[in-house]
């Protein structure tokens, strides 16, 4: 019988918190620099991003499952698990967190550009 690997098999809870906090802090800082017509607020493991003409994004630490959950007004909810290489992966779509953010930024910019043309 195959053993399904759980996040606990890969990292400790202490390392989970460190990596999740670093990821969300870095994302908050990146978006604070890039956002025009919006803001990012990170506290207590929750990152809230509001963008004019796009909507609200939420990123939350989920310590019980050792995940980061994301909610997008464009693409909906996602759950990211940490893997051995300390990279966050959406196991359902096999998409890395960094790739997901790149795609969301592209979609967000496209949506914002479309709103400005009207």
UniProtKB/Swiss-Prot annotation:
Could you say which protein family the record assigns here? Belongs to the frataxin family.
Q: Which InterPro entries match?
A: Frataxin/CyaY, Frataxin/CyaY_sf
User: By its UniProt entry, which PROSITE patterns does this protein fall under?
Assistant: FRATAXIN_2
Self-association or partners: how does it assemble? Monomer.
The protein's name is Frataxin, mitosomal
Q: Which domain of life is it from?
A: Eukaryota
Positions in coiled-coil regions: none
Q: Which GO terms describe its cellular component?
A: mitochondrion; mitosome
Leader sequence range is none
Keywords assigned by UniProt?
Ion transport, Iron, Iron transport, Mitosome, Transport
Q: Can you name one GO molecular function term for this protein? A: iron chaperone activity
Q: In which organism is this protein found?
A: Encephalitozoon cuniculi (strain GB-M1) (Microsporidian parasite)
An example GO biological process term is: iron ion transport
Sum up the protein's function in the record's words. Answer: Promotes the assembly and repair of iron-sulfur clusters by delivering Fe(2+) to proteins involved in these pathways.
Name of the gene encoding the protein in the UniProt record: YFH1
What SUPFAM superfamilies does its record include?
Answer: Frataxin/Nqo15-like
Question: What is its subcellular localisation?
Answer: Mitosome
Among Pfam families, the record links this protein to: Frataxin_Cyay
């Amino acid at each position: 019988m195959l053993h399904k690997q759980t996040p606990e098999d890969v990292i400790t809870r202490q390392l989970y918190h460190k990596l999740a906090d670093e990821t969300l802090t870095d994302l908050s800082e990146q978006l604070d620099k890039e956002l025009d017509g919006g803001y990012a607020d990170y506290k207590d493991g929750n990152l809230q991003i509001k963008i004019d003409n796009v909507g609200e994004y939420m990123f939350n630490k989920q310590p019980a499952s050792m995940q980061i959950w994301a909610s997008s007004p464009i693409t909906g909810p996602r759950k990211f698990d940490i893997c051995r290489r300390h990279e966050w992966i959406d196991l359902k779509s096999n998409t890395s967190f960094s790739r997901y953010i790149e795609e969301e930024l592209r979609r967000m910019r496209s949506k914002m550009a479309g709103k400005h043309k009207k």
